[in-house]
Amino acid sequence: MDDSKRILITKILKNEVTEALGCTEVGLIGYAVSLCNISDPFSIEKIELTLNNGSFKNVYAVGVPNTGKYGLLPAVVGGFLGNSKNKLLIFNDITYSQELEDFTKEKLEIKVINGPLYCSVKIKDNSGKIHESLIKDNHLNVVIPEIKKEKINMEINSSEKEKYKNLELLDFLNYLDEIPEEIIKLVEKTIYTNKNLIKGDFLNYGTDILSNMVNKTTSACNIRMTGENMTAMSVAKSGNMGIMATLPIISYDFSTENNSEKLIKSVLLSMLVTIYSTYNSSYLSSMCGCVSKGGMGAVIGLSHYKNGKNLKKFDSSARTFTANLPGIICDGGKVGCALKLASGCFAAYSSLFVDISYENGIVGKNFKECVENISKISKAMGDLDCDIVEIMSKKEM
C-alpha cells in the first residue's frame, strides 16, 4: 500500500483508540467541568450544563467511577474533584464528596439540544465571574478554553475523515501485511485492557464458543456500565463499542486457536472497520452504535480470524449481519447495554455460517454497501432521540 494511506490509517488509529474510565460521555462531562478550573466549588452560584441529546442519554443512568453513584450529577461533581490533565480519565483517583453533591444539586441547570456531540459548561461564582468550557463534535475537541494540543492527540480533520471513508476493505487488509510497531503495541494494550474487564458472570448459560463469547463480552460491559474503577480501550470514542469490537474476537481466539498473530490482526481489522462505520454515520445516534458499528467490526474481524483474507466471506458475513440487528435503538448508557452486546455477539457469530442474499431488505451487495445502507438508516432515525430523551426525562430517579 502507498505511504499516504498507511500514514493516514496510523494517525486515525492513534486518535480513535484511546483509554477511557467509565462511560465516555460521563468522562466528557467531567472533563468539561474540570476545564472551567474552579478552585473552590463551594463558591459557585450557578452551573449551566448544555448537552446534545445523545450525550444526555448516555449519562442519564450510567455508573460514574469512584463515586458509587449514577447519572449526571455525580459526573459534574467528579469533574470538580478531578484533574483536567487526565481528560477522559478524569475520575481517576478522586475522593467523592457527598457534601459537594448536595451543594451542587441546588446550583445545576441542565439543557438538552439536538445535534452532534456537544457539551457546554458555564459556571458563575460568587464574585460574578463566568467560567466556561465547550467540547463539541468529538470527546477531545476542546473549543473553549483554547488549549495547546499534544501532537499525538491532534484531532482528525474532516478532510482526513473523508479520505478514510473512501478507503476500501482491501486497503485495511493490506495494512495488516506490515503493521507499524507502535500500532502492534496499541492493539496489544487494547487486548490486555479489555480482557481485564471480564469479571464474574453476567450472562453465563453454557461453555460452547458462542456462550463464552456472550459471557465475556457482556461481563466486561456490565463492569463498565456500573462505574467500576477500571479503564477500557475505546474505539471511535466509545468504550462499549471498543468492547464489542474486540472481546468477541478475543473470546473466539481463547476458545479455538490461541494464535496471537491472528488475534492481533483480526482485532486490528475490527477496529479499522468500526472506525470506518462510525465515520460513515456519526459518533452518537439514535441507533445503537455498539451493535451496528462495533458489531460490524466484530463480524469482519471474526471472519478474518476464521477464513483469512477471503473477500467473498467478508461480503457474505456483512450481508448476513445487515439482515439481522441494524435498527436497534440507543436509549443511553446503562447496564442494559450488556444485553444489546449479547445480541451483537449472536449476530456477529451467526454471520460466519449463513449467507443472506442481496435481495433481503436493506442488505447490500458487499461490505461497503452494507455499511452505507446501515449508515443511511442510522441518519434517518435522528428524530427518535427527542422522543427517547422525553421518555427518559419523565422518569423519577
UniProtKB/Swiss-Prot annotation:
Enzymatic class: lyase
Active site (UniProt): C23 (proton acceptor)
Reactions this protein catalyses: L-cysteine + H2O = hydrogen sulfide + pyruvate + NH4(+) + H(+)
InterPro entries in UniProt: Ser_deHydtase-like_asu, UPF0597
Keywords, comma-separated and alphabetical: 4Fe-4S, Iron, Iron-sulfur, Lyase, Metal-binding
Cofactor annotation comment: Binds 1 [4Fe-4S] cluster per subunit.
Cofactor(s) for this UniProt protein: [4Fe-4S] cluster
EC number assigned by the record: 4.4.1.28
Binding site for [4Fe-4S] cluster: C288, C330, C337
GO biological process, one term: L-cysteine catabolic process to pyruvate
Pfam families: SDH_alpha
GO molecular function: 4 iron, 4 sulfur cluster binding; L-cysteine desulfhydrase activity; metal ion binding
Domain of life: Archaea
SUBUNIT field: Homotrimer.
Free-text function comment from the UniProt entry: Catalyzes the cleavage of L-cysteine to form 2-aminoprop-2-enoate and sulfide. The former then spontaneously hydrolyzes to pyruvate and NH(3). May be responsible for the production of sulfide required for the biosynthesis of iron-sulfur centers in this archaea.
Family of the protein in this entry: Belongs to the L-cysteine desulfidase family.
PANTHER family linked: UPF0597 PROTEIN YHAM (PTHR30501:SF2)
Protein name stated in the entry: L-cysteine desulfidase
Lineage of the organism: Archaea, Methanobacteriati, Methanobacteriota, Methanomada group, Methanococci
